[in-house]
């Protein structure tokens, strides 16, 4: 996993992502496709990362085909639902919705996507490595989560976390418990669609100061629509909205 990695592509410049949504329809992009792992890119990564531990380098040489196989299995399961999800994406793209309503629909779709893909991913074992990297979300989603878990989110004006992108096992999510995510049913959209399509968690294990490619499922459509329905709101890390996790003041 790369040190600066977080579950938002382009999160340093959300306005750029938003403008991209305005130019591109996304209704046909729901089907999972690897972000990396095609055309031998993982083989190339293995050669370029000679400084990584030997087991990681060896895995990089096989991760692409393994992940592609898992994606194919997922696609078979996903096919009957693709048209409905594509229709929802088109609706959210074309029609005006109240922000909260649109975000609820998108989060529900992300949960469905996650439930279908997880059995074919390394995430089926809920390894928790990604619970130690920045997780970006909007103020609107923070409010939705806060309402669901009955915790009042703070309102960060600037996100030091998303600028500095600290990561490591010394930076756990405030909702992480010894048994896993303490708000799993309410977790951010970014967490729902962040799926390693390899066979196990080896490439997700955090190595200080080292970048490790991970064959992620393609959730670009979710990210793009998220920026549209939240109207380009600034993003902040989950730790900045909920620094004390479930120990924060209960919302009214």
Question: In which residue ranges do the predicted regions lie?
Answer:
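Short loop/turn segments that flank or connect secondary-structure elements
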Residues: 2-129, 133-180, 184-252
